[in-house]
Amino acid sequence: MRQAIVTLKKGEGRLLKSGGAWIFDNEIDSIMGEFENGDIVIVHDFDGYGMGRGFINMNSKIRIRMMTRKQDQEIDHAFLEMRVRDAWEYRKKTVDTSSCRVIFGEADFLPGLVIDKFSDVLVVESLALGIDRMKEEIVDILKAVLSEDGITIRGVYERSDAKVRQNEDMERVKGFIGEEFDTKVEIVENGVRYMVDVKDGQKTGFFLDQKYNRLAIQRLCKDAEVLDCFTHTGSFALNAGIAGAKRVTGVDASELGIEQARENARLNGLEDRVEFVCADVFDLLPKLEEEGKQYDVVILDPPAFTKSRKTIKNATKGYREINMRGMKLVKPGGYLATCSCSHFMDYELFTKTIHQAAQNVHKRIRQVEYRTQAPDHPILWSAEESYYLKFYVFQIVDEK
């Protein structure tokens, strides 16, 4: 079947020409030929120069997501297998693959698709109409590729229930792909055991992007008193505990998260040294300050305070406040680990916000290290949306 041809306006497609994968609604001059939303189309520059192929959705502001820059490349089974194999080979070289993100959307040149592997379970998240049509074929390819390395997948669960699907005029979907199975799976990361609930946990069930950041805080936590804020299912707290922390307190507002965190503590035999409190962090930290509590290590891993540029001002206030509160609770010479998972809170703004927080509470901070997301969430420099996690470790220093 002949594919429709989309021609860009003169001077448009700047993101595309710099290596990006998105074409927005206001960049298109004309469309020649018939198509349905989700179809693969051919993209031309204003002068007829071939830019590649991608899938189109007229209901989305992101009109086209590019699949290839090669004008004559067919988007078929062989193409998808090539993409999946490339993604898996990259993970085998860069991360512990027992649990990892196998497909990371645009950064793996499969725009809109996320696939996480938790031991022998796959979790799929589809965020774009075109890739949604291909997801089951891609899953079958991935299972076959994994089997070549002796890995058998016992089940696949879909977590395409994010609100962002509504931007593509797609329903939110959650459920089994294929046969039903027990959706709780045990994984081991950095020597810590977790029970992951892929059905009812946040996002795909567990935040794999912080894998090596969790490992990085272990060396700071031996014999330390640690406060882990926004603990979710206890991952940073448990890394502190397994590293030999004297006492760890994990805080989160989610009762389900705290329940799972306590289960994970029991799983690791850490319930005597790692406790979890269900509370709003913004309410609890001022109370701890009033009580004169201080810790050797404070960890701040908040959810994204903003998911759009429109709310960045309020989000900045939130990040500033939480870092001010956190710094006040660190003993002199102690450590603050702080991060932001919002793409819109970029590196420069996050750094500036922490600096302002330190000035506001009259704290001198010494940078220990700066980190980003784990390599299984690769940052593609031509796709700025792939760079979202910023992670700092600081020492709170007093001049003696």
Language model segments and positions:
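Conserved class I S-adenosyl-L-methionine
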Residues: 223-232
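Non-catalytic accessory regions of SAM-dependent methyltransferases
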Residues: 1-119
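Conserved SAM-binding loop of SAM-dependent methyltransferases across substrates and taxa
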Residues: 233-246
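Conserved SAM-binding motif I beta-strand of class I
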Residues: 247-252
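S-adenosyl-L-methionine
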Residues: 256-299
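Non-catalytic substrate-recognition/targeting regions of SAM-dependent transferases
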Residues: 105-116, 135-207
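C-terminal catalytic and target-recognition region of SAM-dependent MTase-like enzymes
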Residues: 335-400
